[in-house]
Amino acid sequence: MSKFIFVTGGVVSSVGKGITVASLGNILKSRGLSVSVQKLDPYLNVDPGTMSPYQHGEVFVTQDGAETDLDLGSYERFIDIELTADSTVTSGQVYSEVINKERRGDYLGGTIQVVPHVTQEIKARIQRLADRSKADVVIVEVGGTVGDIEGQPFLEAIRQMRNDTGRDNVLYIHVTLLPYIQSTQELKTKPTQHSVNELRRIGIQPDIIVCRADYPISEGIRDKISLFCDVERKAVIFMPTVSTIYEVPLKLESEGVGDLLVSRLHLNASPSDLSVWRGLVEKIKEPTPTVRIALVGKYVELKDAYYSVRESLCHAAIHNGRDIQIDWVHAEDIEKNGPEEYLKHVQGIIIPGGFGIRGIEGMISAVKYARENGIPYLGLCLGMQVMVIEFARYVLGSDKAHSTEFEPDSPYPVIDLLPEQRGVDSKGGTMRLGNYPCVIQPGTMAGQAYGNNLINERHRHRFEFNNDYRDTLSKAGMLFSGLSPDGKLVEICEVTGHPFMMGSQFHPEFLSRPNRPHPLFREFINAAKKVIRDGEQPSLPLSP
């Protein structure tokens, strides 16, 4: 039978619940326990797939094609597991299912209420993940902040779980912020006290309180929170801001969190072994040369829109013995001012996924700059598509080349709608989503990167390379090095004669891990670190 850890947040949103949950999973896995994770999002959207990146940030895709919150990406990276659609629950999903059941007559004419019907549906989804994953521990993050109207049914559901499954099988953790008052130069505990009081009013007494702060926390604060929040002193955990998020599991373990979880839930666990993770953090903190990469996108004002891309670049830089500097370049700025101003100092250019015509010409200009100047380039999803468009326009001379996403009547549609997408009007959950196999051509850059002829990668797209132009582009120097097993879909393309110019229709950023960077990112950074740009001087050997 699975044990459950429920994690709530207080005082403010974005306090670090997601990284805390991911770190708890990391700690438990280091003790030989199997872990699964679930995110409960109280918003009424069915999933974030149709939400603006400016409102939600990145949409993370699971192996089975669920469009989910970016926190699931953190869970996968920290715990090194692959999650499924069972790991994401929204109010939209819950209420839709309850209403559908009522329409079918499943409730036998009863009056449908938040309690018990909505809460029962939430609990059923939590239990379903436990049953299917068979994990020793299921960690459940409740999105939002205690006190939010939307979150009340979820808090009531997790309150009931302790009675349903037994007191020894459920643990509550509350993550809260200790704000710092500059004028008095002190951290304040009162917001935490009020947040815990709100939880207790609902019927949940936290077993552990994780206190986030940007400043050192005194032992007197630990005593105060323990007294006023009715939590054991050793269960008041200090989590200061650290230089890298990958240090959080080590900090929590040093505070005794792992031992608390094992003892409170009566887990049959091995001694903790975070030696590999500790080595990773030490490597991150080592002073190393910097590689400078331009990320050209259309949502760069909100960096969380490219969260997995940013982390994947970091993973690859660590592997290559480099720090990473990312220049966040808005594609529309390139349209206005040209690429030289923004790209002349960078050692590599990456263009991630996106939707819509805004900024497309700026992206195409960035691709052209990379190709003509021998700058390593990696295009992801849309980034591959604009790479194809640029090649068709400026190598083949077909200046009308475009994607039918942006120009439906293009006379040279090198990118077109997938055949199965024709006639699909609904936007939610209807793209080509999840893991699909890809056959790699040996002897190519992709073949050298993967070292394997068959791979599986995650997708999220409606448009694809138009095979009517495959022969034409191949003869001009574009190599299609990755195809679907039936050979019908182009998954990877390369430009021959270039140091590193590659595009993938899939999203490799979803499979990168801190200790195991994705092959495409790894080789991209490996190529970029060799580039010397304006104003840079290579290191000279010291005289004997």
Curated annotation (Swiss-Prot):
Activity-regulation annotation: Allosterically activated by GTP, when glutamine is the substrate; GTP has no effect on the reaction when ammonia is the substrate. The allosteric effector GTP functions by stabilizing the protein conformation that binds the tetrahedral intermediate(s) formed during glutamine hydrolysis. Inhibited by the product CTP, via allosteric rather than competitive inhibition.
Amidoligase domain: annotated span: 1-267
Catalysed reaction equations from the record: UTP + L-glutamine + ATP + H2O = CTP + L-glutamate + ADP + phosphate + 2 H(+); L-glutamine + H2O = L-glutamate + NH4(+); UTP + NH4(+) + ATP = CTP + ADP + phosphate + 2 H(+)
GO biological process entries: 'de novo' CTP biosynthetic process; pyrimidine nucleobase biosynthetic process
Positions contributing to CTP binding: S13, D148, I149, E150, K188, T189, K190, P191, T192, Q193, K224
Domain Glutamine amidotransferase type-1 as annotated: residue spans: 299-534
Residue positions of the active site: C381, H507, E509
GO molecular function, one term: CTP synthase activity
GO CC aspect terms: cytosol
EC number per UniProt: 6.3.4.2
Amino acids binding L-glutamine: Y54, G354, L382, G383, M384, Q385, E405, R462
Signal peptide: none
UniProt function note: Catalyzes the ATP-dependent amination of UTP to CTP with either L-glutamine or ammonia as the source of nitrogen. Regulates intracellular CTP levels through interactions with the four ribonucleotide triphosphates.
HAMAP family: PyrG
Family to which the UniProt record says this protein belongs: Belongs to the CTP synthase family.
Descriptive protein name: CTP synthase
Species per Swiss-Prot/TrEMBL record: Dehalococcoides mccartyi (strain CBDB1)
Designated gene of the protein: pyrG
